[in-house]
Amino acid sequence: ASFEHIPVLLNECLDGLNIDPAGTYLDGTAGGAGHSRQIALRLDGAKGGRLVSLDQDPDAVQTARARLAGLPATVVQINFRYAGQALESLGIEKINGALLDLGVSSHQLDDAARGFSYRADAPLDMRMSQQGETAADLVNTASREEISRILRDYGEEPYAWQIAGHIVEARETAPIETTLQLADIVASAMPPEERRKNCLLYTSPSPRD
């Protein structure tokens, strides 16, 4: 699936990077290569200018490689937390600037098969890299305490303990396998007034365009 990524603050990002045509730059979140392509277009490969663009999502990597073809850019499939490792493997000791556009992309939300959105019923996946444990694995095996901690620490969810309890109770009847199944369980754990007030909040994560 091809990423469509229109950078919202492109000019501001480029101004902030103050690109040197002979410099080395890192884009830690390639996505659809919207930022990466514009950075690479401003680099002069003949003078040593180079972009290293990272993403853990194989769809994003495939798209970025196609859109950066012929430019002084290298695309690596890896999480940006391992940027140092990626740069070292390419023999790069220092960079002139880095860009991180963090969040879930609109492409990932719009692709129901990825399991990030509750707009359509789909397998409960939610993996950025499409490797390792799925969200379904987590909600069907983790303890109430662990699920509550994740919701509280990463989602700042005030009803984390109640939601975790409903998840554990529901999975005793049948495995939780789809996005809408989980959404219904989450909604059932909310007080009626909160459910009405936050009906939109609990139907979709915030997208990164």
Regions found by a protein language model. Give the residues of each.
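S-adenosyl-L-methionine-dependent methyltransferase catalytic core, i.e., the SAM/SAH-binding region
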Residues: 1-204, 208
